[in-house]
Amino acid sequence: RVGFVSAHFRWHSVGRLTIGLLERLCTSRGLQVFVIDASSGVEGSSGSGSGGAGSDALRTAREAIAALRLDILVYGDVGMDAFTTGLAHGRLSPVQVAFWGHPGTTGLSTIDYFVTSDLFEGELGAGWAGRSPDVVGDEATAAGGEGDEPETRVGAERHDRQHAFSEQLVRLGGLGFIFDDPALTLPSSYGGDGRAASSPEAMEKREADEANRPRLYVCTQSLMKMHPAFDAVLAGILAADPLAQILLLRDSRQLLWHSRFRRRLRAAVDAAEQSANFAAVSTCAAAAVNGTGPASSPTRGGLWGRVRFVSPLSGREFFRLQCRADVVLDPFPFGGGVTTLEALACGTPVVTAGALQSVHRLAEGLIAAAANTQCQGREEHHPEEHKGEYIAKAVAVAAPGALKRKVRRALRCGRNGLLHGGGGGGGGGEDGSDVEADWERFLTNAAA
């Protein structure tokens, strides 16, 4: 008897990640699944629960859930919703679990397990945990042996990330979700097999046409995730690519916050422009002294003029925007989840800096699953070096050419596996069966 509780079983990141999985698990012979809606039933609400988050409402809800006599209770949004977070403070089932739909520890002694993915933790967690990739690799070999298939079981964690959680980490081999979403319909220019429908000649002509058009760098994350440390990256992209246009979201419900962010970003962009103009003047002066002629002139028109803000879009409009983007930018230290998944689902390259994330490296894991590759450990550098690498990667992949074609082709070919929770390196299926089996195995073992 397994219960899943959330205030977001609707058009919300948590609901979209879990509903497909629940539909599968409800047909499992070995599980009796209870779906517990902790919302007020009002679309767009914060999930105030049965009449509110007061003590009486919490007591009533806790008694109702306890009466189900569940073996396991899985929470989808602890930390995102006040009511479900209040529920999670109580012991309503012998075993209680949190899902990575909200990527961080609950810090509660009443939550026993945190379900995540090898693609989000593994060697990807090395720099965040302050360990080198070599140390993580040694631990992985000692735990299972080189080349062994990862085993999904209660306690299947490595120690590089465990210290950051009050719960015991349970790392599934795949992503742990089934994302069946009709809104994610590829544009008609893409073939049914996920490859571009154009001929090589047509693609070359399109690239020639794109060579001098503006390049769209899109960051579709909410304002809460726009950390000051990320401002320098946005400014650096504008300075590095004279054709770059950066598109950011603007929410009318956060006008004061937005105005402060706008001023802060403007200051970073202006500083980058001054540095770029100084470098250009120095280069021209050196060229004149050496008799080689002028190399380039300072930037004219202003970098800030290439920053655009758009109001929130509908689901389909949002997806189409990401399909039109040349590259999607994942911010740090708190990056995207479902929005990154959507970008990868339409074959748009995503650039991220996993080493600068303070939570699970969701974007790196999703990229690995979409491109059907293994996540590899990497040497960790000073944060400024990672920012420089981020800018260089974004500019390189946004430009027309072989790299852009290669990345988009790989993402489109791996689309089905990504949406159905498959793991990187060929470790996940494309029909959701592997994800269903992972969850059934974990739930059965946890209840034993």
Label the model's feature ranges.
Residues Q221-S222, S252, R260-R263, C284, ...:
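C-terminal amphipathic helix plus adjacent low-complexity
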Residues I72-F83, L87-L108, G315-L362:
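A donor-sugar binding/catalytic signature common to diverse glycosyltransferases
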Residues R91-R195:
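Active-site-proximal region of nucleotide-activated glycan assembly enzymes
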Residues A53-R59, V307-L321, G335:
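Conserved active-site histidine-acidic residue motif and adjacent donor-binding/catalytic loop
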Residues F9-R29, G174-C284, S297-L313:
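Conserved catalytic-core segment of nucleotide-activated headgroup transferases in glycan assembly
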